[in-house]
Regions:
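Thiamine diphosphate
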Residues: 1-112
Length: 112
């Protein structure tokens, strides 16, 4: 998802600056980097392939709600796979997060 997030950040050039944080490991999670980025930008869009419900993105959002809520200028947005069984390859592109969905989430967050 990192290359996709980087493409979305490029699409936003001229509208806003974006910082893409690559969470390379789940254990140990670099919580300091996550919190520093939230404090620096004031806005967070989490992108993950997994379905929205019970995904790791929800855990990241919970950490931000507990530890960075006063640094945020809006809600944490998540761009995820849909809450449906993972589809066959023929419709996978409709299921997966896209550059357009990520950029749209960032634009909506900027308007918050």
């Amino acid at each position: 998802m990192v290359p996709l997030a980087e493409q979305a950040a490029e699409e936003l050039e001229g509208e806003a600056s974006a910082e893409v944080l690559d969470i390379r490991t789940l254990k140990p999670l670099d919580e300091d980097a996550l919190l520093a980025s939230a404090a620096k930008t004031g806005r967070v869009v989490i992108v993950q392939e997994a379905p929205r419900t019970a995904g790791f993105g929800a855990e990241l959002a919970a950490i931000l709600a507990e530890k960075a809520i006063l640094d945020l200028r809006g809600p944490v947005f998540r761009v995820t796979g849909y809450d449906v069984p993972y589809p066959y390859w023929s419709i996978e592109d409709a299921y997966m997060p896209s550059v357009e969905r990520v950029a749209d989430a960032a634009r909506r967050l900027l308007e918050f």
